[in-house]
């Protein structure tokens, strides 16, 4: 699937920057174009892989390149005012070669959480291609203002995109890690999961063709109903075969020698085990998978370690667990890979306790901020006025 990726804000820019690096290293053919948008000049300068002419600084007249200070209402205003500058960078994207737009943003900050929904609305008005969002939720320990920003941005972002893929920082934090190390690892996790998902079906010249191809239309159809999506991932190390002579026919027939039957059974069992682990393990947004409207399963790895029987069994298991009859599946052969990975996209999930918890904390933070503001006005009056009101101000 060929994507035009737009990173909005600091977190969004870093994730898209990482996607460009991933795409280049693996020759995956996912990122057709990449743009970074920010109101903080320093954040744009910190990017390594996005071309400099595709980095857009907005809000210079309002915030002088210093960011919006976690004020996402200001972030939304700036994005609306400077949308033409962003469009200028998007104009250089060969849209006829793109399957969809992906707007990536952290939902807890100011620029991204305010500006990403504005950009998504703008793109949907102009282009016929689907516009997806990738929203990153802040950790619950990051503070009330970031939780409030995330709850408000999430609500708006879901309405403005064709589908919102969500990654929850809370589910991926590790104790004792540095701030920088923690975010780098989280960005790595995001890119690995979505890289396998979007990379399936993008075959370059000379590459192995999948037995059951997952092309961009299958991903688009899985995301078509809108709402919120989550992604599961599991992998297992394997020994790649020295001579990759098996190819498509051997995978269809179960091997080129009769004694390959044991290997076929082992391969099938590994695939079904990976599917279960991906669906029931750590999802990008933890939720109950029962009730998901649609699902897509992609198995990636050396071609000799993939087979149709395992994928069919995995697909059937997902149907049983979700109750959905709209479960697509396929493989993504990567000759010479040292692991087999299973990726599951669950679209239209609704039983998400983390979102309800986020909203509850946000409401408390909103009430608390208003209360403190009122108290602050009263306390300031008490401080500056004398008790008997005998002093007169200068003017």
UniProtKB/Swiss-Prot annotation:
Gene inactivation effect:
Swimming defect. No differences in growth rate or cell size.
Task: Note the superkingdom of the native organism.
Answer: Archaea
> GO CC annotations?
cell division site; cytoplasm; microtubule
GO biological process assignments: cell division; microtubule-based process; regulation of cell shape
SMART domains assigned: Tubulin
Q: Which residues cross the membrane?
A: none
Q: Where in the cell is it found?
A: Cytoplasm
Q: Where does GTP bind?
A: 10-14, 110-112, 142, 169, 187
- PROSITE patterns attached to this UniProt entry: TUBULIN (PS00227)
Stored Pfam families = CetZ_C, Tubulin
Assign the protein's first listed, main location to one coarse class.
cytoplasm
An MF annotation (GO) of this entry: GTP binding
Q: Which residues form a coiled coil?
A: none
Could you list this entry's UniProt keywords, alphabetically sorted. Cell shape, Cytoplasm, GTP-binding, Nucleotide-binding
Q: What does this protein do?
A: Involved in cell shape control. Essential for the development of a rod-shaped cell type required for efficient swimming.
What family does the database annotate?
Belongs to the CetZ family.
* HAMAP family on file: CetZ
- Which protein is depicted? Tubulin-like protein CetZ1
Species in which this protein is naturally found? Haloferax volcanii (strain ATCC 29605 / DSM 3757 / JCM 8879 / NBRC 14742 / NCIMB 2012 / VKM B-1768 / DS2)
């Amino acid at each position: 699937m060929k994507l035009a990726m737009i990173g909005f804000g600091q977190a969004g820019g870093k994730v898209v920057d990482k996607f460009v690096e991933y795409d280049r290293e693996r020759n995956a053919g996912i990122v057709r174009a990449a743009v970074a948008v920010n109101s903080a000049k320093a954040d744009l300068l910190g990017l390594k892989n996005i071309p400099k002419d595709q980095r857009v600084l907005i809000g210079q007249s309002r915030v002088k390149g210093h960011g919006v200070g976690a004020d996402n209402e200001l972030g939304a205003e700036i994005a609306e005012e400077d949308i033409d500058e962003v469009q200028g960078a998007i104009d250089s994207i060969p849209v006829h070669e793109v399957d969809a737009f992906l707007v990536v943003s952290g939902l807890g900050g100011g620029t991204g959480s305010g500006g990403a929904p504005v950009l998504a609305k703008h793109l949907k008005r102009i282009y016929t291609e689907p516009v997806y969002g990738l929203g990153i939720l802040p950790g619950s320990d990051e503070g009330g203002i970031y939780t409030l920003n995330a709850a408000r941005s999430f609500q708006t972002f879901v309405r403005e995109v064709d589908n919102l893929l969500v990654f929850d920082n809370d589910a991926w934090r590790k104790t004792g890690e540095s701030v920088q190390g923690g975010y780098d690892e989280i960005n790595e996790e995001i890119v690995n999961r979505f890289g396998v998902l979007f990379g399936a079906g993008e075959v370059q010249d000379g590459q192995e063709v999948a037995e059951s191809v997952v092309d961009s239309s299958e991903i688009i159809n899985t995301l078509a109903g809108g709402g919120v999506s989550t992604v599961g991932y599991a992998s297992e190390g394997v020994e790649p075969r020295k001579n990759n002579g098996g190819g498509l026919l051997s995978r269809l027939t179960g091997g080129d020698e009769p004694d390959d039957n044991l290997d076929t059974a082992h391969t099938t069992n590994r695939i079904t085990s990976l599917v279960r682990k991906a669906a029931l393990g750590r999802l990008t947004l933890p939720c109950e998978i029962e009730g998901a409207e649609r699902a897509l399963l992609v198995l990636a790895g050396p071609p000799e370690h993939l087979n149709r029987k395992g994928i069919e069994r995995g697909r059937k298991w997902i149907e049983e667990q979700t109750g959905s009859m709209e479960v697509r599946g396929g493989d993504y052969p990567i000759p010479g890979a040292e692991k087999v990975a299973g990726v599951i996209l669950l679209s239209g999930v609704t039983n998400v306790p983390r979102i309800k918890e986020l909203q509850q904390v946000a409401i408390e933070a909103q009430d608390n901020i208003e209360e403190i503001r009122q108290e602050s006005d009263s306390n300031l009056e008490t401080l500056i006025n004398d008790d008997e009101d005998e002093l007169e101000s200068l003017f």
